[in-house]
């Protein structure tokens, strides 16, 4: 049975396919003046004939490389191409692009291995097919197996693997399963840690079960590491390979599972340094490829409401990702029962023992369900993703491996101790502010405080018992009491206080005389005496506001925080906001300290002129400024009413109007939430607002409050560790004993430290766009001096004798989008303004895309970069407005709208309509605006689509790109441009004009993002072809790719990375009809060869938990950053075809 449908592409595409785009000019930018423009160098080594450039002055790859990569497409220039180039150059000049401004780069000469095919496209198909063939041979029998072997009636309860005879169910102990292709499921008893307790597997021949020794030997405690001391907290479990499941280490193996990365993390051989060849097929990832959903659709699937008619089509084509839902979608039948799982989640090991047979049957039923899903789902996947590189890339992504050593435990310990120290300091500062605020109770001074006026200042009195009515007892002075006369005098003086002890009530109030809000911050003193021993989990009691923290509602008030100068205030229904006065007098104001508010932030001029009651009724909705929380939702536009427009001129900050008035004297405006105006802010000291302090948008209104600045600094430092601590500390690290370590780890020169590994639980295709997902490592930030624990990635450290080699793909998505526009509109690299700026633009002279956009609109380059990428991903003008106001809160809504409109007119252009041919006789054949087209269609009583062709973008630097993206996205079966993968069925279903526009932003985003996934999969295939088994895949996140390789092979691996980039981009341009590649994108700017996982090999990763950096704190030296020329030199020459393993292949 053949599942891969191979599409043949012509090596040369007809020129008629690429129609020239007409571009309307909105403004002319003066070309940047180039001073001392360098001359094109003649390559000393290769000679002047190696240099090549195209008709728009974009430097192309060296001639020797072109001959090897595009052997059937010799370079030649026709008269028609020269004539077209004049048009392209004129358009580039009109958009302010100086094609003479780019500086050439040195040519590169390389002898590449021979292509495995007639051209680069056949080459990648053939090498990908070679890589997946061993696994397809194991996978296809499972897919074609209509009936699994009969499940055993009784499962053997003994340690290790047991095989069951398919005829009579006889149990036979085995070291590991005998077959290499398995459907597999693991169960874990959560209360006992992350190690597996039982597992089941099935092949086409027999069933297997595995039982942990903890289950059979009643050993309840998690084993501690004995061979090497990790020097760690004894409360945290540590795992060795003895607790994991062995699968064998010889030859290729295939494991199928649902969310199989969870099961993989419990397999013994996956933690060994050498790759075993076992790969994993995840039915959840296959489901995401075939029937994945947007975030909006996922919310609809979770909703219990009756779906709208327009949603019924895609609801039938998709589901949530759980095994139960996926099985229901593809297999139907009875719903799977998941009740036994509760014992694993909530129960104990003893309960698992008591229900061993039923729980093992539950595990086996999940295996059977996974197999049924595989039989239906894999043929769908193979049909929709025909290129073998897609499957090869998924298999490689599922083998991620992160080596660690004892420094991992040191990192966790240092980060946690620093976090606790900073927490104590923040608590101290807040406690001091709380104690100082209590003094406002005197003479009701709190009524004049702008932040604490609405807190509960009620106090409790200490009521003493009535003294008994009896005669005082005579005092008898003992001569030998030992007290001095002075002591006796003081005792007599204060005796009345000692006597009042008997008058205290049995149940004494907490802190009598203190306000209620303060008492809530304090703990009651314990009933135990001070000399009694505390329990292990009991904290010692301390007086004062010991329960206060930055996460409490009182904290922003104690710090006197302001937003844009206005005091913060909290309303239960609206969350955090701030007060803006609209009256200049305090008459009739009951509670609010109006005089102090007016002194702190005077009433705006507009309010002084019209301080009427009607002002409070004028509500306006700030222009949402966001495409949608999720691109799959329909966009809703709301016009501003006259009252709303009036209010917009009154307040020009970034607050969100919510029609709330306090004491008939001031407006309450909500703080802006990152998810939109319908959300409320729960804590202005959270990570989302920390940057606002640096911008002085959030600040303390009390100039004397030094504590506020320090608490804010501490909050900024703690946010990363607070949000990621549980995931980081919960990583399943498996430590290797000395017998499992290669000789390089245990030599005389090696330090006696522990070595282990983490198998990150990567979902190979976790999103609609097929991006991989993993909650810790794929979201890890780069280290920052003010971010506690952000050195996380650098704690992945290569063992002795190994190096981590990798690179960051430069502007991957931007290049993909621009080259699609170049090929579609011109058939020439860099012939569109966006294409030229991407390929030859330079940040240093301001000719790159982000610099030109920033200069034209009047914003910073960094902000322009974010908005540019958001636009390419499909976001609209409203989203750009929100970003502009988020970056610069001083922008008014009208200013942000004007800048966004200007940006979109310059970049995206104007949307125009062209008449269909049958209307040329009665109407002028020209470009019509949306309004004109709609009016003409209505006049003829026809739909827009009947009178006009699909609209196009015109006149912008990115018009050609968006026209091509929309053409792909609006097709009946959208496919990725490189590997031909299809869009999810959930977005293909019921594609009509309305549905098409509804999901268009998501579809455009899918074209770019899913194209980037194709690019990654091709890189993985190429690196495996060039380096074979000499590299082990570590991780890919964002646009970065990292491998583990032996130190002596690291220069060759670095050169292989450069060649991988060259060949992958060559394949991509060939698939869209271009037969050449620009030199600027042919190779990585640098490949990092390092001992730790960090973005740049020179980063020292200084953080609050690592103040001395890696060099001094850990003794880790900087790595090497190799250009292609340096990699060639260190690899021993430019003839890659002579590498030993390549010659043998």
Curated annotation (Swiss-Prot):
SUPFAM superfamilies: DNA/RNA polymerases, Ribonuclease H-like
Biophysicochemical property: pH dependence: Optimum pH is 9.0.
EC id: 2.7.7.7, 3.1.11.-
TM region positions: none
Cofactor: Mg(2+)
GO molecular function: 3'-5' exonuclease activity; 3'-5'-DNA exonuclease activity; DNA binding; DNA-directed DNA polymerase activity; nucleotide binding
Pfam families (alphabetical): DNA_pol_A, DNApol_Exo
Top-level taxon: Eukaryota
InterPro entries per UniProt: DNA-dir_DNA_pol_A_CS, DNA-dir_DNA_pol_A_mt, DNA-dir_DNA_pol_A_palm_dom, DNA/RNA_pol_sf, DNApol_Exo, POLG_palm_dom, RNaseH-like_sf
One of the protein's GO biological processes: mitochondrial DNA replication
UniProt note on regulation of activity: Stimulated by KCl, and inhibited by the small molecules o 2',3'-dideoxythymidine 5'-triphosphate (d2TTP) and N-ethylmaleimide (NEM).
The entry's keywords: DNA replication, DNA-binding, DNA-directed DNA polymerase, Hydrolase, Magnesium, Mitochondrion, Nucleotidyltransferase, Transferase, Transit peptide
Entry GO CC: gamma DNA polymerase complex; mitochondrial matrix; mitochondrial nucleoid; mitochondrion
Disruption phenotype: Larval lethal due to severe defects in mitochondrial DNA (mtDNA) replication and synthesis. Larvae display a severe decrease in body weight and a 70% decrease in mtDNA levels but are able to survive on maternal contribution until the third larval stage. RNAi-mediated knockdown in male germline cells, results in defective clearance of paternal mitochondrial nucleoids (containing mitochondrial DNA) during spermatogenesis.
Family: Belongs to the DNA polymerase type-A family.
Name assigned to this protein: DNA polymerase subunit gamma-1, mitochondrial
Organism the protein comes from: Drosophila melanogaster
Gene of this entry: PolG1
